[in-house]
Amino acid sequence: GSSMSYKAYPFFRDILINECIYFASKNKKLVRLNYKSEAYVGVWTEESVAVSFLTSRDIPFDKVVKMDVDRFATYELDELFDEQDHIIMNQTMEEEGHLLNVVAVTQEVMTELDKIRIKEFVQDVAKYDEVYGLTKKGSKQFILISENDSDEKKPHIMPVWSIKNRALKVRDEDFEECDLITIEGSVFGEWLDELRDDHKAVAIDLKTGVVGTIVSAQKLSNELTF
């Protein structure tokens, strides 16, 4: 594999900002585009660009599907693609688009998003001195969950939020049996030490559907400034 970085491309920044990508589907299959006389699945960072391109080229499609990039990385990537598969990013009337290894580009995007989110979380907590988490009724501890609902592993990930409305949304959609509570930064720091000693992990500002950035307690505690 090449050590080519995708960071310099405009699409990379678009995905970091909007956290979503677009595919076109026809008869429940992903639409493929021609690129140097081969056909690859087309991906776009803007819905309107996808629609106008497909329409102008008379490429048949039923709909353009918006996909959250965390959900894509967590659930769809392995379902839809093999290790060596390539996609065409942002093909338009003017541009032939970029041929990308889908696994490599997804990994690089998610690595970058993780870095950004860890930094923002640490800054928010340092500034507002509040960490939100979920508790089972009557408990004072934040809950632990497993990755991707897998029951094989004991729950080892503590979901925490610095963004209250996102925490509430996830509570309402995915954990309605739980209460949302808040603790001070210093208390979180102590809990993090315990998690680190137990080799556990932390999920930072998870989205609904329980997807997002999961990081070892060790790594997060290295980043803390409070």
Where are these regions (language model features)?
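Conserved NAD+-utilizing ADP-ribose enzyme module
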Residues: G1-F226
